[in-house]
Amino acid sequence: MALWGGRFSQESSALFKLFNDSLPVDYRLIEQDIIGSIAWASAITQVGVLTTDECTQLHAALNELLAETSTNPELIIASGAEDIHSFVEQSLIAKVGDLGKKLHTGRSRNDQVATDLKLWCKKEGQELLELLGKLRTALIELAEREIDAVMPGYTHLQRAQPVLFGHWCLAYVEMFERDISRLQDALKRADTCPLGTGALAGTAYPMDRVKLAQSLGFASPTLNSLDTVSDRDHVVEICSDASISMMHLSRMAEDLIFFNSGEAGFIELDDEVTSGSSLMPQKKNPDALELIRGKTGRVYGSLIGILTTMKALPLAYNKDMQEDKEGLFDVMDSWAICLEMAALVLSGLQVNRERTLSAAQQGYANSTELADYLVAKGMPFREAHHVVGEAVVNAIAKQTPLEDLPLEELQSFSAIIEADVYECLTIESCLAKREALGGTSLPQVKSALAGKQVIPIALSI
């Protein structure tokens, strides 16, 4: 039986019921719906709707239902209820009879689902923070293990300047720390309790909403009933945070896919995160990384979906908002598995130091050092840039590195070049000079790594 049947003289069509019912999606809110109902039973007891004995009976029945459904979610789906709220109420009535019909007094499914969803976001959000923390740890451990491996840094996917592999790892640590901070901020803003605001105008029962919020673990109650039941900002914000984080995951995956390619050969991925070809026996494909990259678009789609759903809704609640959960659930599931998989990939990754060093020594990645050398000799940088460009063209034509050009040939481009030029053209010199804060010199990378190890980031809200 629908919770709203009294107004209607005929049954809903089977097609409408299939179209309207949300239980196949929102069954995942069972724990939150029951927890919220337990808190609501206590709240309406305090304003005289229920006796203490009735409240005790409802609490017992709700806890029993929670135990039953936590191990058998199929029980929920098989009920054929309209939504998770209807399932809980119908189950409660089956257990305690007419007493179960009193629980919804003063409450609407509008404030009920808003409460359920925020409780779910808080719980799942905390789990995502922990997964982000584990990925951060995996990157730090990889940076520590391969801190001084030399590799080419790229711009436009062209070799640019040499960097340390540890520096590359710590670049992604910075990104994922920002993701942690963003999610923490979103969860703080979501830490307000909607329960007790009714359908849109507030509840007619003079309950203590501050106490009600505290009983559910919220920092405070919401302050405007119209906004409360209309609000899905927390869904939008979490999907946005997930999209940014997935973008970071996808960029890291793309880097690693390239590093793993035969053309680069910088790293070797562990067998447990790769797969083969059904036709080509030699293939070892980076499927884990490619799926991370692929799932990023899926998460973006859910963000656009909820933004588009909400963009023109009048106050207060509209049925359109039922579409909030499917995308959110998929976002959180996709984000979680990608974080776990990325950490697993990193844990088994091996760096081919000979190959990375060889690549860093090619592509004239020391050209900037020659320009800086000329600047130190008194030449304006723009002129030095031009001189070095000419020298590089000459070296390319002769298929030789800059450091292998004879001194006389280098001096043909600028008379201020002396024999000490070769000292600045080594890989070691290129790296050592990047000693300003945030640079890729070994002391700077070691200092940055030590800071990440000594000061663990907070992973709660």
Curated annotation (Swiss-Prot):
GO terms for cellular component: cytosol. Keywords: Amino-acid biosynthesis, Arginine biosynthesis, Cytoplasm, Lyase. It is an enzyme of class 4 (lyase). It is found in: Cytoplasm. One of its GO terms (biological process) is arginine biosynthetic process via ornithine. The keyword Lyase applies. This is Argininosuccinate lyase. It comes from Shewanella piezotolerans (strain WP3 / JCM 13877).
